[in-house]
């Protein structure tokens, strides 16, 4: 009996960290970017048939903060979130594949697209292509936007210094 090797981070069978990463990328991406990238990645193929387990719905989530960033928690306020859950229809019956999505805002179509992409990323036939053509471009776009925001903030930074008296 040989020991089974752990799944790689790129395999659809990998556990939470890889899935958490691609879901975070989709949650932070704009709908237009997500839709365009998903259409390119599917290469003209129609989106798969699915059944809604939870159609896109809008609700509120309590946003919590911490005093000083590390202290006691307090309720900062509420934020609007949209979530969706679907199950791919698979005539081969290889198992149930469930896609989920949750993001800030009220965009139901964005939640639907993210849930479909999440489900497809869990299938062996679509995983590698979607990682390369959907998640990687969206992640690099988000990184570029983040770098631009940091650069804009850095240009307004003020450096304070003190001089020693009496020397």
Which functions belong to the PLM regions below?
Residues 12-14, 18-22, 33, 93, ...:
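Non-catalytic, beta-rich accessory domains that mediate macromolecular interactions or localization
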Residues 89-91, 106, 163-165:
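Generic structural motif
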Residues 94-136:
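A hydrophobic, small-residue-rich beta->alpha segment in the mid-to-C-terminal subdomain
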């Amino acid at each position: 009996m040989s020991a089974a090797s752990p799944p790689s981070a790129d395999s659809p069978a990998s556990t939470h960290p890889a899935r958490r990463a691609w879901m975070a990328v989709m949650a932070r991406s704009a709908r237009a970017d997500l839709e365009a990238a998903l259409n390119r990645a599917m290469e003209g193929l129609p989106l798969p048939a699915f059944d809604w387990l939870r159609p896109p719905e809008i609700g509120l989530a309590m946003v919590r903060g911490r005093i000083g960033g590390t202290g006691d928690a307090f309720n900062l306020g509420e934020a609007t979130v949209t979530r969706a859950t679907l199950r791919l229809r698979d005539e081969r019956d290889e198992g149930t594949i469930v896609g989920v999505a949750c993001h800030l805002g009220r965009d139901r179509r964005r939640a639907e697209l993210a849930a479909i992409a999440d489900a497809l990323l869990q299938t062996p036939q679509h995983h590698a292509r979607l990682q390369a053509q959907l998640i990687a471009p969206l992640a690099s776009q988000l990184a570029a936007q983040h770098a631009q925001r940091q650069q804009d903030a850095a240009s307004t930074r003020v450096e304070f210094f003190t001089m020693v008296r009496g020397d």
